[in-house]
């Protein structure tokens, strides 16, 4: 059994000498037994209240891919040799990409040179990014999006990628 200390808290107001129910004037200080209740964030409480007040109908619900089971027919979408074009009916926002992997400073310089001279050969570039779960001494990435596979092929045949930067082909959903 855990020990805990108590302290006396003076009662506010005049003292009553009549026949009243006695209230405790002690409160616990320090560790107590049992788990301590955590406060919920206000946003979470408001969201839960809104969900109870305004339940979603099937027509207003949004579909998230993460909550759906894996569709075996769509696993080929990760294959870069996949015959699907951009605008595949099941993935209309899918676009071809190139992930450039290497030294962060080299990637930044290369991205800057691309923006100055080869802007028509790609659609968008990301900032330099890393995987957060890896160690500090890991390589960085820059992702380049294209409007079509032919644009990506033209980019790869035209642009000389500096040594030390690895090119990884793929495609991914575009976020607008």
Curated annotation (Swiss-Prot):
Cited Pfam families: PPV_E2_C
Main location class: host cell
Family membership noted in the UniProt record: Belongs to the papillomaviridae E8^E2C protein family.
Comp. bias intervals (Polar residues): 18-37, 46-66
Gene Ontology cellular component list: host cell nucleus
InterPro entries the record matches: E2/EBNA1_C_sf, Nucleotide-bd_a/b_plait_sf, Papillomavirus_E2_C
A GO molecular function held by the record: DNA binding
Annotated spans, Disordered: 1-70
Gene3D superfamilies: 3.30.70.330
Described function: Plays a role in limiting the replication of viral DNA in keratinocytes. Recruits the host NCoR/SMRT complex to viral replication foci to mediate repression of both viral replication and transcription.
Name recorded for this polypeptide: Protein E8^E2C
GO biological process entries: regulation of DNA replication
Keywords: Host nucleus
UniProt subcellular location: Host nucleus
SUPFAM superfamilies tied to this protein: Viral DNA-binding domain
Keyword Repeat found: no
